[in-house]
Amino acid sequence: MTLRKNIIYRFFSIILLSKGVSDINVVSYGWEVFERNSDSRTLALAQSSIGYPIQNPGTILLNPALSLSHNNMIGLTHQSRMSGTSNSEFIGFDKYINDSSWVSVVMLYEGVDGIPDTRGALLDWGLDGIFGTFDVGEGNGSLDEGERLDVDKIRLFNQNIFGLYGAHSKIFNNWRIGFGLKVILHTIDKEFGIGAGLDIGAFRNYNNTGIGLIVKNLPSSGLIWESGNIEISPPSLHFGLHQKFSFSKYELEINPMFRGSILSLDKSIDSELVLGKIPVEFSAGFEAILKKKLFFRIGMFQRGTLASGIGLSWNDFIIDYTFLNDGFVNGIEKNHLLSVSVSIERLKKYFSNKIEEVK
């Protein structure tokens, strides 16, 4: 307990000291790892499942109130983009606090290798490419026609982002209220920054209709860099609707869903403007479940790009596949994602048997 108090005290001491000696910037970036990284099922539904009550590791990143019951599965997802230059990892599981309470945990990683640093590498010699002639473009600090970079002065560096998200929810006046605490460690070359943020979500199911609400970065999420600079991300509001249709004769479920987001600074070129100044975005998803074993999914992001996926479920093993072709959410190329969820009890049994074999 004393150690925990010391950590909290030091964290807030850094914040207070930094405010006195650094710049504070309100930015629209810094927490994208919690938006881009998820599991295959969530991304196949275009991240529109804010009001869809499913036991899925990535759902709590959309709405912490969807930590509805303890899920005895651990979910793993790997994604590689841009010919292996960018890689991301996703791990999600639930951890009991006591016999009747639990925390849903997600661990994230995203790394980009081999980023070129061209500072100081420009041969700023103008249009003719010859030093000292003082022709057009020479010495202006910009890469102009006829100029080039000195390859020997270009070096490569890496960027790494580690994220940790914990969600817990409780029933309050027929609504399930959830709190999501997120922590981030961001390194760029030799620089690093740490930050924390809070999301608050709500969910209610009424006659097979799910309603979800979440405020992200409340009151704001902060990232403190080693240099002392502080980057603050303002809050945004997201809401979702889901409707369940059951056809018991065919053992079939149909689940359409919708998401709307009212943004602040984190808008994109595809955002719609309400009243000419309020950026909003929409996405939609659809999932069909046959005999609770076979899943078919399709989703549409704000920019109109389609996502699709399938899934197979057994008692203690789930596999999901998703195909994405969305430059805004997941890079500039087509992406294939594969997620695997395995029962923790099955893993314990497997490793116990291996240990016994070694003995």
Name what the model sees in each region:
Residues 1-2, 123:
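Low-complexity, intrinsically disordered short segments enriched for Gly/Pro and polybasic residues
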Residues 12-22:
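Hydrophobic h-region of N-terminal signal peptides that target proteins for export
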Residues 3-4, 35:
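A general structural signal for short secondary-structure junctions and capping/turn motifs
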Residues 23-359:
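Subset of outer-membrane beta-barrel
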Residues 4-14:
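Sec-dependent signal peptide recognition
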